[in-house]
Design a protein with these regions (language model features):
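C-terminal substrate/ligand-recognition segments
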Residues: 225-227, 231-238
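Well-ordered alpha-helical scaffold segments within catalytic/enzyme domains
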Residues: 187, 191, 237-246
Length: 269
């Protein structure tokens, strides 16, 4: 498994099927759970499964609702579908290509001779079309799984290598101070997260995002950040060090904070 900013890239290996058995290789995708109505679509010609889900974990934290919020996905498979169908609760609907409701899912099966399948899943908070665009931009067919693994490694090593540690006493492996430090730095560099999505290319160009304060989709020239550490003030203070290592995004983060203030007329920092 590897990833890009808005794409997950998975490689599934299937054991060889035994003769006279029905152990066909398959992948199942859960689209919605109880009390949440979503959609799912199967396109066997393009070898894609797509859908949407309005569930969000913070829905019970306050009176505000976001009727325009949904998470969208497009999963593209490297092998053709031998068969497929929709699950709706306990109901199995073979050869059905779309569904709407709770407890919704989809399965796709492959030829019994298939022993490996790659799945590239683009995600978006804007639309299914944008999820597909994210997939095409960040994980085109020309980029192999192994290429994606190396690109992700290089991206993180470039950031973590900005700090070099010397003179640390070696201790037991599970208490190695360097491991603890770099793990904390890795976690710190993930937030606040860039919530915007590319409209043209990975680097540069206009971007789009879902804005929770207005429950609308927006566009702009800059990135838009979310996932702030605002529960307790000292947690944001801890963020100063990771932010010092990424000065290229500081202006965008501050612009987003000002935008949040203007939208809600209340400071977020």
């Amino acid at each position: 498994m590897t990833a890009a900013s808005h794409v997950g890239h998975l490689r599934f290996g299937f054991p060889e099927s035994k003769p006279h058995t029905s152990n066909e290789p398959y992948v199942f995708i859960q689209a919605t759970r109880q009390n949440w109505t979503g959609n799912i679509f199967i396109d066997s010609e393009s070898q894609e499964v797509s859908g949407s889900n309005p569930q969000r974990q913070d829905y019970a934290l306050g009176p505000y609702r976001a009727p325009g919020f949904s998470g969208y996905f497009v999963s593209r498979f490297s092998q053709p579908f031998a068969s497929y169908g929709i699950t709706h609760g306990a109901s199995l609907q073979a050869n059905t290509t779309e569904g709407t409701g709770e407890h919704l899912g989809a399965w796709v099966k492959f030829d019994s001779s298939c022993n490996e399948v790659e799945v590239r899943t683009g995600v978006s908070f804007v639309s299914i079309a944008q999820a597909r665009k994210n997939l095409d931009i960040e994980a085109p067919s020309s980029v192999s799984f192994d290429d994606a693994v190396e690109t992700l490694k290089e991206a993180w090593l470039e950031k973590l290598d900005r700090v070099q540690i010397e003179g640390v006493n070696e201790t037991a492996a599970e208490y190695d101070q360097r491991t603890i430090f770099y793990t904390g730095l890795f976690h710190g560099l993930q937030y606040p997260s860039d919530f915007s999505e590319p409209l043209e290319t990975i680097e540069g160009g206009r971007r789009t995002w879902y804005e929770g304060y207005t429950d609308q989709v927006r566009e702009g020239e800059d990135s838009y950040y979310q996932s702030w550490s605002i529960w307790v003030g000292h947690r944001y203070a801890i963020r100063v060090f990771p932010d010092m290592l990424t000065p290229n995004r500081t202006l965008s983060v501050l612009n987003t904070a000002c935008l949040h203030f203007s939208r809600r007329n209340a400071s977020t920092v």
